[in-house]
Curated annotation (Swiss-Prot):
Pfam families xrefs: TruB_C_2, TruB_N
Identification of the protein by name: tRNA pseudouridine synthase B
Function: Responsible for synthesis of pseudouridine from uracil-55 in the psi GC loop of transfer RNAs.
Record CDD domains: PseudoU_synth_EcTruB
Organism encoding this protein: Cereibacter sphaeroides (strain ATCC 17023 / DSM 158 / JCM 6121 / CCUG 31486 / LMG 2827 / NBRC 12203 / NCIMB 8253 / ATH 2.4.1.)
Length: 301
């Protein structure tokens, strides 16, 4: 007999406006506890000191997490010029200083190298695995790591403000796997003055926006109540970047069993990824081929 999972079978998304000083895992655990949910996971880690959008998937919505982690994300952050730290943010020990301060024009010129397809070396204190161990664990032990550069798509990177000579506020829209701390570090090096992230906020992630997020304080206040459920968004929100194909009754039945099922296609092309719905409910995600959806993920709703 299968093991019974404890908790309520809730499926959907809860968008949390994560506060500084809390890990992404701690937020997920709080959401799971507050909703008494059987299953929960987040769609993209935020550093403990960062704030903003942390999209928490519940139940069957965890099957749509890859579509959010792969989506574009927007970050606003302040770079502190003139100082490098061990962690590339304000929490770390200062390891280098400079009296040089670039002009706005010099910063703008330097940003050009950080747009488009770039190669980025993760921070020493990051979750990247090195021979099975997390980089931050090795860095805490004093090791200096030679981390490999990784590709990153930067859609845009713009100056928002220049409060003073020591600071510049930036906004970046990027793809999966980007480290804002690396941008601040490398920008400082490119300008010859060092730099680190003073503060960081993720303003949106795929279809989810910070202004629609619920605070951790509100989660605590509404914990274990039906009122908290009203903040849970539909599972389909995580599929916003994929075309929706209505399934026929027979097609929906076949899809639920993991078999190709007939769908009503409009302008979806052969081989394109899409999701099927029936009577307003998501049924499956898969590849469209000749009038049928071939499922890769099936939702048990």
């Amino acid at each position: 007999m299968g093991r019974t999972r404890k908790g309520r079978a809730i499926s959907g998304w809860l968008v949390v406006d994560k506060p500084a000083g809390m890990t992404s895992t701690a937020v997920v655990n709080k959401v799971r506890w507050a909703l008494e949910a059987q299953k929960a996971g987040h769609a993209g880690t935020l550093d403990p000191d960062a704030t903003g959008v942390l999209a928490v998937a519940l139940g069957e919505a965890t099957k749509t997490v890859p579509y959010i982690t792969d989506a574009l994300k927007c970050y606003r952050f302040m770079v502190r010029l003139g100082l490098s730290t061990r962690t590339d943010d304000a929490s770390g020990e200062v390891i280098a200083t400079s009296e040089a301060r670039p002009t706005d024009a010099e910063i703008e010129a330097a940003l050009a190298a950080f747009r488009g397809e770039i190669q980025q070396v993760p921070p020493q204190f990051s979750a990247v695995k090195v021979e099975g161990e997390r980089a931050y664990d090795l860095a805490r032990d004093g090791e200096r790591l030679d981390l490999a550069a990784r590709p990153l798509w930067v859609e845009s990177l713009e100056i928002l403000s220049r409060p003073d000579a020591d600071h510049v506020e930036l906004e970046m829209v990027c793809g999966k796997g980007g480290y804002v701390r690396s941008i601040a570090r490398d920008l400082g090096e490119a300008l010859g003055c060092h730099g680190h992230v003073a503060w960081l906020r993720r303003t949106w992630s795929g279809p989810f926006e910070a202004e629609d997020g619920i605070s951790v304080a509100t989660i605590d206040e509404l914990a274990r109540s039906e009122a908290l459920l009203s903040h849970v968004l539909p599972l389909a929100k995580g599929l916003a970047d994929l075309p929706e194909l209505p399934a026929t009754p027979e097609g929906a039945a076949r899809l639920r069993c993991g078999n190709p099922g007939m769908v009503i296609a409009s302008d979806v092309e052969f081989g394109e990824e899409a999701w099927a719905s029936f009577q307003g409910q998501p049924v499956a995600v898969g590849i469209y081929k000749s009038g049928e959806l071939h499922p890769s993920r099936v939702f048990n709703l």
